[in-house]
Amino acid sequence: MLVAGAGLAGLSAAHDLLAMGAEVTVVDARDRVGGRVLTVRDGFRERQHAEAGGDMIDDDQREICHLARELGLKLTRILRRGFGYVRQNGTKRPRIVQRRAGRGWERLAERLQPVIRTYRLAEQRWDSPIAARVARRSVAAWLDETNADQELRATAVGLRGFFLADPEELSLIALVDQFSADHDAAPGTMYRIEGGNDRLASALAVPLRTRLHVKTEVVAVSHRGQGVRVSVKNANALSQISCDYLVMTLPASVLRRIPFTPSLPAQQHDAVARLKYGRATKTLLQFSRRFWRAPGRPLAFGSPLAFGALWEGNEEQRGASGILSLLAGGAASDATRDIVAKEGAAGLVRALDWLGSKRADLVAWRQVVWEDDPFARGGYAFFDPGFDTALRPWLARPCNRIVFAGEHTSIKWQGYMNGAVESGRRAAAEICATHDSR
């Protein structure tokens, strides 16, 4: 078996395939494992760290929770007070307008109820005419049609920290699907892996030993007959790997650049080609003291402002210093980068005056722009009004001896680390089921 990608999806697939007794090789173009899970330790004081990629784990995300515990990793609860909400007041100064951001989510859900009821009649099937009609509208168009007030519009803009897309870019189906789910749409109880989320990827990689090859990029795939032949590039040298099955976990943003012989089915090709990835800039700011802490105040905030959403990135760690994590999605990613280009990190610090940033010194910082990462080309997938909803199942559909995984293939947990883990384990189970039936 060959697994393309050593992110959580690929490593989870390899973990289960090894348990089934398969011989597994994993390749990844990066010089590390983890993919879009990236724990940053270098440069921070007091041996602190924070997540520059996948960060929070919800308590109902069973697959990643079970896998972490299976590997002996502890989950630490974080952000117990949930998210607050920040927006500009009449004088254009940011201020905390809601101690509980869930109220904004509730108002959106209430306004969406007529659309949600219809969507549920279709049993939330994306191949239904109902879903297709909903999906053709952008969130911005729906806000205009329903004469949404400024508060509701600001909440929708703030969701770019969740979907990584602005209301003009995001299909209404994304909101409707989120609020139609049985679980609470707003964030609930949240955790991180103690010591860093990258410990999960590292633990999964240990059994692979010499069967893990980093700095090895997939450049072509041929799938004829009873096997798959994968062309890879390593240190400018081309070679080929033959395998019985290929688990392809690369994001669609990268996958669509890889030639397949023969070509993938037309619907699958179109699904991969059309799927969009959100702009996402993650900035980690370490301060000399945790000035943002105050009685009754949340440690996390959503906002429609240039810095995006922010939260305490290391509340579970000791030390006087503390790290604020800023996630700027969609247009906020561009705005955050502009601030840093013109003013340096000090510009972001000034943008946090409302939180009390003048009461501490910035001692270290790190920024990762995921749309500039050649092996991600974005934070994670989102659905725009141009995506044909009937194509969504094709993202996860096996093709001959190739199975597909990655957060973009998950139905319930698309965009989450749990979606990556779940999809990788599903891909391994699909190979087992296919092999047993032959």
Where are these regions (language model features)?
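FAD-dinucleotide binding site
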Residues: 1-438
